Amino acid sequence: VTLANGADNRIVTTTSTSGLNGESNLTFDGTKLSVQGGLIHKRRAVTSNTTAANDDYYLGVSASSTVTINLPNASTLTAGQTFVIKDEAGSLSDSVVINLTPAGGQTIDGQSTLSLNSPFAAVNVYTDGATKYFIY
């Protein structure tokens, strides 16, 4: 990897044959980020009740009984941060659901809990970075 250091420690040029990995926060201040090739998101397998970590992105649920995923306090996240939750097993029904629950007093599109109960259902939620989550 070759990085050229510009003003204010900004990367002005980068070339790599093996990729660029940001160990902490990698921020692009321009108008767009163009990615050629694939984009790989972090995936975590979920089989029982859990709390999403601040650095989670995709939570793939495979469970034969109801699972509750507690979302982090929105104020600990960056506005626009996204979580994807998916029933990978296709086992959801009226009696087997995925419940998404934000931190106390916070909401998802105005609701205190969001429940998925259709086989292979998925939902994308993002936060305002303060008190709310939204479905998109």
Task: Report each predicted region and the residues it spans.
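Short, low-complexity N-terminal tether/leader segments at secretion or assembly junctions of large
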Residues: V1-T2, D29-Q36, G105, S115, ...
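Disulfide-braced loops of extracellular cysteine-rich modules
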Residues: T2-G6, L20
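Small-residue hinge/turn detector
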Residues: I11-T14
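Short loop/beta submotifs within extracellular cysteine-rich repeat domains
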Residues: G19-G22, I108
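Exposed extracellular interaction/assembly regions and N-terminal maturation sites
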Residues: S34-T101, T127-Y136
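Beta-strand-rich interaction surfaces with strong enrichment in secreted/lumenal proteins
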Residues: Y58, Q111-L116
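Short edge-strand/loop segments of extracellular domains
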Residues: T101-D109
